[in-house]
Amino acid sequence: MDYQKAILDKVSTGLRLRMLRCKSALTHEDLAGLLQLKSPRVIYDWESGMKIPNAENLYNLALIFNMKMEDLLVMICSF
């Protein structure tokens, strides 16, 4: 049986997060504050594709940017 497997594109997801943050006129510090993160470094790590937000942060990012959680992520389908 053939099926498609979805793989998270961390770099493209990070670029999407950066675009959303900039479009919302938020600094790294602003967004870190809204998410109650200890350091804005986490935002830099997400935007560079080094790390991805956990489920709780994805949920809160979706609320901040007024969109669905799954729309924050960039997925690549492979066979």
Regions found by a protein language model. Name each.
Residues 25-45:
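Short alpha-helical DNA-recognition segment
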Residues 18, 29, 59:
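Residues within the helices of the helix-turn-helix
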Residues 56-71:
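DNA major-groove recognition helix of helix-turn-helix/homeodomain DNA-binding modules
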Residues 46-47, 57, 76:
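DNA major-groove recognition helix of helix-turn-helix
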Residues 1-7, 63, 73-79:
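Short, charged recognition helix plus adjacent turn
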Residues 1-23:
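A short, Lys/Arg-rich alpha-helix, primarily the initiator
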Residues 21, 32-33, 62:
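The alpha-helix within a helix-turn-helix
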